[in-house]
């Protein structure tokens, strides 16, 4: 527990007061208002980024809720998966994503996805130590359209590359702490995504090396019906 508290303090100072993420009333209105800014990644249809999805306080509460699950107590474990009934904080996060998407007059997700219930029912939490990444992949077809990724603690560059060889160039997107990226349509099915650390184990953004520390990502998806 001391290690968890240390990680929280290192990431957010003393902003975490121990209150559960799902219990904070302000979380229920997150994303509603002028502060939410969605950016469409022009090169890839269906790829949207919300850099300010979670405030510092929201990030701290969410990180605390994840660490309290006890998934990463052993250093050899760096991934946790859940299917069906998700933890309350994850269900709340799904609701916040839906609220944020619906709060803007933009086609951030296809309309038919917004009507499905639940929006997401599968969760992956990945813990990346400095220098770690994930190879290029397209998510399995056992999952429906629409994938959400929330980033915590440390920034990283996610690289998108065409799933089939063509003349399209790779596209890099900076995922900052508290950001939300959504993939649907072409972005979900026709582009691979990765966190590439093959060169010296670190990443560079706009000519500057990223100060990479521990990073936690939350991926939300919807299983296809049998």
Language-model-derived ranges and their functions:
Residues 1-226:
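Non-heme Fe(II) oxygenase metal-center motifs and adjacent flexible, charged/small-residue loops
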């Amino acid at each position: 527990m001391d290690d968890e508290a240390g990680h929280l303090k290192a990431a957010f100072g003393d902003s975490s007061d121990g209150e559960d993420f799902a219990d904070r009333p302000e979380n229920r209105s997150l994303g509603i208002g002028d502060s939410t800014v969605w950016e469409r990644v022009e090169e890839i249809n269906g790829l949207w980024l919300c850099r300010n999805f979670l405030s510092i306080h929201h990030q701290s509460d969410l990180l605390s809720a994840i660490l309290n699950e006890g998934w990463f107590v052993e250093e050899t474990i760096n991934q946790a998966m859940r299917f069906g009934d998700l933890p309350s904080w994850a269900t709340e996060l799904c609701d916040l994503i839906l609220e944020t998407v619906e709060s803007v007059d933009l086609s951030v997700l296809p309309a038919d996805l917004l009507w499905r219930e639940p929006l997401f029912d599968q969760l992956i939490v990945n813990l990346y130590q400095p220098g770690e990444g994930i190879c290029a992949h397209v998510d399995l077809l056992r999952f429906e359209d629409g994938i959400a990724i929330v980033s915590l603690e440390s920034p990283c560059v996610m690289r998108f590359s065409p799933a089939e060889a063509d003349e399209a160039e790779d596209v890099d997107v900076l995922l900052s702490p508290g950001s939300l990226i959504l993939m649907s349509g072409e972005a979900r099915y026709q582009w691979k995504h990765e966190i590439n650390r093959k060169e010296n184990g670190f990443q560079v953004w706009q000519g500057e090396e990223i100060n990479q520390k521990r990073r936690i990502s939350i991926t939300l998806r919807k299983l296809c019906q049998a």
